[in-house]
A protein has these predicted regions:
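Primarily secretory-pathway and cell-envelope proteins
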Residues: 1-16, 40-100, 123-175
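Secreted/periplasmic proteins that engage bacterial cell-wall peptidoglycan
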Residues: 27, 32, 38-39, 43-46
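A glycine-anchored, Pro-Gly-centered beta-turn/N-cap motif
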Residues: 19-21, 25-33, 104, 108, ...
């Protein structure tokens, strides 16, 4: 098994960046929550994606899933799992310096303030939003999901995760 490329991030707090490659959690990369970014994060580039595959262990016999994120996503990694980064790079989420935008995934209380937000679509039916209570396997932990046909108002609790795809804007509104 070939281990991926590790390098120091030029961004926040000397975070380690894990490039495309193969990583056994607990051996090659520490367990925890990670942000996975596309190579092109300029201007919230909607056509740039990152792709990872996560396996239950390093035998690759039990695939948890293949995930593709627009701009960036968040995922929890546990000891013994096997992560394959095909496209993009990963960095510890607490050191990733994520700021709210119109695409990607955000944790309330760390990347954005908890509260009520209005999400407006880029164009009718072009995007979606989802709320998760955990980012270990995504769909098992989804609280809410909707396509964006018109502006919607969502309440985001501390610790919840908001995923946006092709939103035109997001703004905080009074609770």
């Amino acid at each position: 098994m070939e281990t991926g490329e590790r390098k120091r991030a030029e961004s926040s707090e000397d975070a380690v960046v894990y490039g495309p490659g193969s990583y056994v959690i607990g051996e090659d990369i520490l367990p925890g929550e990670y942000a996975v970014f596309t190579e092109d994060t300029s201007e919230q580039n909607a056509y740039s994606t990152c792709t990872i595959t996560l396996y239950k262990d390093d035998t690759d016999a039990r695939r948890i899933g293949t995930f593709q994120f627009q701009h960036h996503g968040l995922i929890s990694l546990y000891k013994g799992q096997h992560l394959v980064i095909t496209k993009g790079y990963a960095v510890e989420a607490d050191r990733a310096g994520i700021t709210p935008g119109t695409t990607g995934m955000y944790k309330a209380g760390r990347d954005m303030e908890p509260g009520t937000y209005r999400i407006t679509p880029l164009t009718s039916g072009s995007g979606y939003y989802a709320l998760y209570n955990d980012v270990r396997y995504y769909y098992d932990y989804i609280d809410e999901y909707a396509a964006l046909f018109e502006p919607v108002t969502v309440n985001i609790a501390n610790g919840q995760y908001l995923e946006l795809f092709d939103a035109g804007s997001i703004e905080r509104v009074p609770d």
